[in-house]
């Protein structure tokens, strides 16, 4: 098994972090996905903020018995700090809808759409959101040569944090026939767009601002670059002409609203160098809440400190009937 693959865990781990408070929050983190460690680190700051805000907090590292554990602890709200499979893909929201427990972040359909790169792409294009050319390749296709003219990007269908993403440049010693499909039997092959990496934080339908990511070491914004200090600079606000900056925010709000997202989200774009054309990459319905994370940074620029950001997210908690 690849170290980043989903792994099955039978029992949840439950820890009481604060036994008194105005409401009982179950902070859901960890879990069984490839992004487990990112989720756990994100939850550290969230738990401190929740306690500071006066909530009773129970931490749950989610396992397969999660429904039973939720029945036992009876939270008023679930703060969904999970990333990846089961938490970000609509699985947990579906369970919480059945149990009628209010939860933060997006619901079943929005989460599932955003998590699956094929279906989110169809949704984007249907709503006239510009994207790079791409094709879907199945393992059973047994493709021996490059499926697209280089440079191109290989993306697993349902991984976040750039896990499994590879950029194949013209000079790379890479044979597609040797690609082992480590994250499932399908991948998206996407045209590589050379340009500026732009990220927008959206909260409750309103774009808070945008930043630009300047790579310092690696060739693209991969897992290592995202979570290692010194691998990238964040320019906040993104140094763009006013009209282009405004367009970026409007496009992000459009994506958020057409997908019926809830709470926080992060929209990702590439601004092509030669044409100044915006290409949407994805929308992330479970953006990280770590010290290096983008949404808290943009929120701070917009005048919302981390604790207040968590409070605003809590206010959106609901279930779908």
Swiss-Prot record:
Reaction catalysed by this enzyme: 2 D-alanine + ATP = D-alanyl-D-alanine + ADP + phosphate + H(+)
Cofactor binding comment, as recorded: Binds 2 magnesium or manganese ions per subunit.
Main location: cytoplasm
Domain of life assignment: Bacteria
Residues involved in ATP binding: 147-199
Enzyme class: ligase
Residues of the ATP-grasp domain: 121-315
Binding site for Mg(2+) 1: 268, 282
Keywords attached to this entry: ATP-binding, Cell shape, Cell wall biogenesis/degradation, Cytoplasm, Ligase, Magnesium, Manganese, Metal-binding, Nucleotide-binding, Peptidoglycan synthesis
Pathway as given in its UniProt record: Cell wall biogenesis; peptidoglycan biosynthesis
Binding site for Mg(2+) 2: 282, 284
SUPFAM superfamilies: Glutathione synthetase ATP-binding domain-like, PreATP-grasp domain
Pfam families (UniProt xref): Dala_Dala_lig_C, Dala_Dala_lig_N
The keyword Aminoacyl-tRNA synthetase is annotated on this UniProt entry: no
One cellular component term from this protein's GO annotations in UniProt: cytoplasm
InterPro entries noted in UniProt: ATP-grasp (IPR011761), ATP_grasp_subdomain_1 (IPR013815), D-Ala_lig_Van_CS (IPR000291), D_ala_D_ala (IPR005905), Dala_Dala_lig_C (IPR011095), Dala_Dala_lig_N (IPR011127), PreATP-grasp_dom_sf (IPR016185)
GO molecular function: ATP binding; D-alanine-D-alanine ligase activity; metal ion binding
Family listed: Belongs to the D-alanine--D-alanine ligase family.
Full protein name: D-alanine--D-alanine ligase
Annotated organism of origin: Rickettsia rickettsii (strain Sheila Smith)
